């Protein structure tokens, strides 16, 4: 039987700011606390991490920083959810290139999508990276 990709607890972390900029020392402190507590996965750039207010550059930096800092000691789940499928695909590709272990997408908000539209949204994001085959 194939081993599960994730086990144990995961934490969705906040994105600390100081003077309008990401506070990377504080971010590392948050990551260190989670690792010391035995957390098995960390969600970066989810709603708790202020994903909707981050620039694309900030999002890419946070995910890359988390992957590098955690260095395989836990899984990194990268938030790629937006109201725009094409933008979520771009974020998914960036996250995969940075080494994120999984993606977190959201249902498009403010638009009432059909069930077929929702399926297309999620499948498009899921199939956007070369790692898509790993989940099958």
Task: Give short role names for the model-derived ranges.
Residues 1-20, 47-49, 62-77:
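N-terminal small/glycine-rich loop or linker at the start of catalytic domains
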Residues 4-8, 29-43:
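N-terminal glycine-rich anion-binding loops that anchor highly charged ligand groups
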Residues 9-26, 54, 76-86, 110-115:
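Active-site mouth loops of central-metabolism enzymes
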Residues 21, 34, 66, 95, ...:
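Conserved, mostly hydrophobic/aromatic
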Residues 39-65, 80-85, 105-118:
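Glycine-rich, proline-tolerant flexible connector loops at the mouths of alpha/beta enzymes
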Residues 84-95:
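Catalytic cores of alpha/beta
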Residues 134-135:
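Conserved small/polar residues in nucleotide/adenosyl-binding loops
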């Amino acid at each position: 039987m194939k081993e599960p990709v994730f086990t144990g607890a995961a934490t969705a972390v906040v994105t600390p700011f100081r003077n309008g900029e990401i506070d990377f020392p504080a971010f590392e402190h948050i990551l260190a606390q989670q690792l010391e507590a035995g957390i098995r996965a960390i969600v970066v750039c989810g709603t708790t991490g202020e994903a909707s207010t981050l620039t694309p550059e900030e999002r890419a930096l946070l995910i890359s920083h988390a992957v590098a800092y955690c260095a395989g000691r836990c899984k990194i789940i990268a938030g790629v959810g937006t109201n725009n499928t094409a933008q979520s695909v771009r974020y998914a590709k960036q996250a995969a290139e940075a080494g994120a272990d999984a993606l977190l997408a959201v249902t498009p908000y403010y638009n009432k999508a059909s069930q077929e539209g929702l399926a297309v949204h999620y499948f498009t994001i899921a199939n956007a990276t070369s790692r898509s085959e790993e989940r099958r």
